[in-house]
Design a protein with these regions (language model features):
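A short beta-strand-turn-helix
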Residues: 3-4, 8-40
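Short pre-active-site segment immediately N-terminal to redox-active cysteine/selenocysteine motifs
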Residues: 37-40, 45-48, 112
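Conserved redox-active cysteine motifs that mediate thiol-disulfide chemistry
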Residues: 44-61
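Conserved segment of the thioredoxin-like fold in thiol-based oxidoreductases
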Residues: 54, 69-100, 113
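Extracytoplasmic/secreted envelope proteins and their assembly/folding machinery
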Residues: 56-60, 79-86, 136-139, 143
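Thiol/disulfide oxidoreductase modules built on the thioredoxin-like
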Residues: 87-92, 99-158
Length: 158
Protein backbone atom coordinates (compact mmCIF):
# COMPACT_ATOMS: atom_id res chain seq x y z
CA UNK A 1 0.00 0.00 0.00
CA UNK A 2 1.37 3.35 -1.05
CA UNK A 3 0.05 6.83 -0.41
CA UNK A 4 2.21 8.51 -3.01
CA UNK A 5 1.38 9.30 -6.59
CA UNK A 6 3.64 8.52 -9.55
CA UNK A 7 5.37 11.87 -8.99
CA UNK A 8 6.36 10.86 -5.45
CA UNK A 9 4.11 13.48 -3.84
CA UNK A 10 1.63 12.63 -1.11
CA UNK A 11 -1.63 11.44 -2.61
CA UNK A 12 -4.13 10.89 0.21
CA UNK A 13 -6.57 9.54 -2.32
CA UNK A 14 -4.18 6.66 -3.08
CA UNK A 15 -4.39 5.31 0.47
CA UNK A 16 -6.51 2.24 1.10
CA UNK A 17 -6.58 1.03 4.69
CA UNK A 18 -8.27 -2.04 6.12
CA UNK A 19 -10.82 -1.71 8.89
CA UNK A 20 -9.70 -2.00 12.50
CA UNK A 21 -10.24 -5.60 13.58
CA UNK A 22 -13.17 -5.83 15.97
CA UNK A 23 -14.92 -2.65 14.81
CA UNK A 24 -18.02 -2.59 12.65
CA UNK A 25 -16.85 0.71 11.16
CA UNK A 26 -15.59 0.09 7.60
CA UNK A 27 -12.00 0.76 6.54
CA UNK A 28 -10.86 3.80 4.60
CA UNK A 29 -10.40 3.86 0.84
CA UNK A 30 -9.72 6.27 -1.98
CA UNK A 31 -13.44 6.48 -2.75
CA UNK A 32 -14.09 7.86 0.74
CA UNK A 33 -11.77 10.83 0.24
CA UNK A 34 -12.58 12.02 -3.27
CA UNK A 35 -15.71 13.26 -4.99
CA UNK A 36 -17.48 14.44 -1.84
CA UNK A 37 -19.68 17.55 -1.95
CA UNK A 38 -17.75 19.00 1.02
CA UNK A 39 -14.22 18.42 2.29
CA UNK A 40 -13.61 15.44 4.56
CA UNK A 41 -11.83 15.64 7.91
CA UNK A 42 -9.19 12.94 8.43
CA UNK A 43 -8.15 12.52 12.05
CA UNK A 44 -5.11 10.42 12.94
CA UNK A 45 -5.52 9.04 16.46
CA UNK A 46 -4.54 6.25 18.85
CA UNK A 47 -5.95 4.92 22.09
CA UNK A 48 -2.56 5.37 23.80
CA UNK A 49 -2.47 9.06 22.85
CA UNK A 50 -3.57 11.25 25.78
CA UNK A 51 -4.10 14.39 23.64
CA UNK A 52 -6.28 12.30 21.29
CA UNK A 53 -8.62 11.62 24.20
CA UNK A 54 -8.78 15.35 24.93
CA UNK A 55 -9.73 16.29 21.36
CA UNK A 56 -12.15 13.39 20.82
CA UNK A 57 -15.08 15.25 22.37
CA UNK A 58 -14.40 18.37 20.29
CA UNK A 59 -14.40 16.39 17.04
CA UNK A 60 -17.52 14.49 18.10
CA UNK A 61 -19.32 17.80 18.73
CA UNK A 62 -18.29 19.12 15.32
CA UNK A 63 -19.72 16.02 13.66
CA UNK A 64 -22.96 16.17 15.66
CA UNK A 65 -23.57 19.95 15.48
CA UNK A 66 -22.06 20.83 12.11
CA UNK A 67 -22.71 17.66 10.13
CA UNK A 68 -19.06 17.31 9.15
CA UNK A 69 -17.71 14.13 7.58
CA UNK A 70 -15.05 12.68 9.86
CA UNK A 71 -12.94 9.64 9.05
CA UNK A 72 -10.10 8.28 11.11
CA UNK A 73 -6.75 6.61 10.79
CA UNK A 74 -5.94 4.50 13.83
CA UNK A 75 -2.17 4.87 14.18
CA UNK A 76 0.14 2.16 15.57
CA UNK A 77 -2.60 0.91 17.87
CA UNK A 78 -3.66 -2.54 18.98
CA UNK A 79 -7.09 -3.23 17.47
CA UNK A 80 -8.50 -4.38 20.82
CA UNK A 81 -7.33 -1.15 22.48
CA UNK A 82 -8.84 1.00 19.73
CA UNK A 83 -12.12 -0.90 19.96
CA UNK A 84 -12.29 -0.47 23.73
CA UNK A 85 -11.37 3.24 23.51
CA UNK A 86 -14.08 3.98 20.94
CA UNK A 87 -16.65 1.96 22.90
CA UNK A 88 -15.86 4.10 25.95
CA UNK A 89 -15.70 7.53 24.27
CA UNK A 90 -18.06 7.01 21.34
CA UNK A 91 -17.30 6.59 17.67
CA UNK A 92 -17.89 9.71 15.55
CA UNK A 93 -15.99 8.28 12.57
CA UNK A 94 -17.80 7.23 9.40
CA UNK A 95 -14.81 5.09 8.47
CA UNK A 96 -11.58 4.11 10.21
CA UNK A 97 -8.50 2.74 8.51
CA UNK A 98 -5.90 0.81 10.45
CA UNK A 99 -2.27 1.94 10.19
CA UNK A 100 -0.83 -0.66 12.53
CA UNK A 101 2.65 -0.48 10.98
CA UNK A 102 2.78 3.33 10.88
CA UNK A 103 3.48 3.31 7.13
CA UNK A 104 0.73 5.82 6.29
CA UNK A 105 1.98 8.05 9.08
CA UNK A 106 5.41 8.08 7.46
CA UNK A 107 4.02 8.81 4.01
CA UNK A 108 1.75 11.57 5.33
CA UNK A 109 4.70 13.08 7.20
CA UNK A 110 3.17 12.81 10.66
CA UNK A 111 5.14 14.37 13.46
CA UNK A 112 2.98 12.56 16.01
CA UNK A 113 -0.62 12.07 16.96
CA UNK A 114 -3.11 13.55 16.89
CA UNK A 115 -2.98 15.24 13.53
CA UNK A 116 -6.05 16.31 11.61
CA UNK A 117 -6.30 17.01 7.89
CA UNK A 118 -8.98 18.67 5.80
CA UNK A 119 -9.07 16.90 2.44
CA UNK A 120 -10.74 18.43 -0.62
CA UNK A 121 -12.95 16.56 -3.05
CA UNK A 122 -9.98 15.95 -5.36
CA UNK A 123 -7.91 14.35 -2.57
CA UNK A 124 -5.76 17.42 -1.96
CA UNK A 125 -4.82 18.26 1.62
CA UNK A 126 -6.28 21.73 2.14
CA UNK A 127 -5.23 22.12 5.78
CA UNK A 128 -3.20 20.21 8.34
CA UNK A 129 -3.51 20.71 12.08
CA UNK A 130 -0.69 19.26 14.17
CA UNK A 131 -1.66 18.46 17.75
CA UNK A 132 -4.99 18.25 19.52
CA UNK A 133 -7.87 20.48 18.45
CA UNK A 134 -8.62 21.63 22.01
CA UNK A 135 -8.90 25.03 23.63
CA UNK A 136 -10.46 28.18 22.27
CA UNK A 137 -7.58 29.20 19.99
CA UNK A 138 -7.13 25.75 18.44
CA UNK A 139 -10.85 25.28 17.86
CA UNK A 140 -11.16 28.76 16.35
CA UNK A 141 -8.19 28.15 14.04
CA UNK A 142 -9.56 24.79 12.93
CA UNK A 143 -13.09 26.14 12.38
CA UNK A 144 -11.69 28.99 10.26
CA UNK A 145 -9.80 26.42 8.17
CA UNK A 146 -13.05 24.47 7.74
CA UNK A 147 -14.76 27.66 6.53
CA UNK A 148 -11.92 28.47 4.12
CA UNK A 149 -12.04 24.89 2.79
CA UNK A 150 -15.80 25.06 2.24
CA UNK A 151 -16.66 22.46 4.86
CA UNK A 152 -18.53 25.00 7.03
CA UNK A 153 -20.51 28.11 6.19
CA UNK A 154 -19.35 31.35 7.80
CA UNK A 155 -21.45 31.97 10.89
CA UNK A 156 -22.09 28.26 11.41
CA UNK A 157 -21.36 27.90 15.11
CA UNK A 158 -20.70 24.48 16.58
Amino acid sequence: MRCQGSDGQLDVAACDLAAVDGLETPGLSRADLVGNPRPVIVNVFASWCVPCRAEHGVLTQMVEKDGLTLVGINYKDKPEDATKWLAELGNPYERIGSDLSGRVGIEWGLSGVPETFIVGSDGTVLFRYVGPVVGETAISTFREALIQAGALARGQNG
